[in-house]
């Protein structure tokens, strides 16, 4: 429940970053980005029946690494083509799971910033993987309210997104 997800961070001595639920929701509100939407449309999806699947998965993992490095260095990215590639490749479970697995104590704040930004600008149909990654990072940081609201955002985008449904049962 909302009370439980708010009480957990407080009980751990972590103050809530937003004065109310509206502030939290405003911080993750979607923002349309037509350039990214157009780039995403132009990137070929992975065809699992054709050859080259691993090459495209590797391309996705490397794009995640490059974007994370850019966020670590600059706190943002202006490379909308790279962002679009990450969004497209996160539809692949291997790439998404890789992205989830690279979060560490050392980079969790960078990854939080990156996933939040991508979740806000992702076009419809591409929000669920990023929102789920953002949710997992928030859960690791002890922010149950943000983790829960991020999962809700993922399920609004794709109501049957398996990882979001699983994490919703976990927390």
Locate predicted features.
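Charged, compositionally biased boundary regions
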Residues: 1-171
């Amino acid at each position: 429940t909302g009370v439980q997800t708010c009480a957990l961070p407080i009980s751990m001595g972590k103050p809530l970053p937003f004065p109310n639920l509206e502030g939290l929701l405003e911080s993750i509100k979607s923002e349309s980005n037509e350039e990214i939407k157009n780039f995403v449309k132009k990137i070929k999806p992975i065809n699992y029946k054709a050859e080259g699947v691993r090459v495209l998965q590797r391309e996705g993992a490397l794009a995640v690494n490059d974007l994370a490095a850019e966020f670590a260095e600059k706190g943002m990215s202006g490379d909308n083509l790279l962002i679009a590639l990450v969004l497209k490749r996160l539809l692949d479970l291997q790439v998404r799971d890789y992205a989830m697995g690279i979060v560490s104590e050392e980079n969790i704040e960078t990854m939080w910033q990156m996933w939040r930004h991508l979740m806000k600008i992702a076009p419809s149909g591409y929000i669920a993987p990023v929102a789920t990654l953002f949710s997992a990072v928030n859960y690791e940081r002890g922010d149950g309210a943000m983790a829960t609201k991020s999962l809700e955002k993922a399920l609004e985008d794709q109501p049957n997104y398996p990882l979001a449904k699983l994490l919703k049962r976990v927390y």
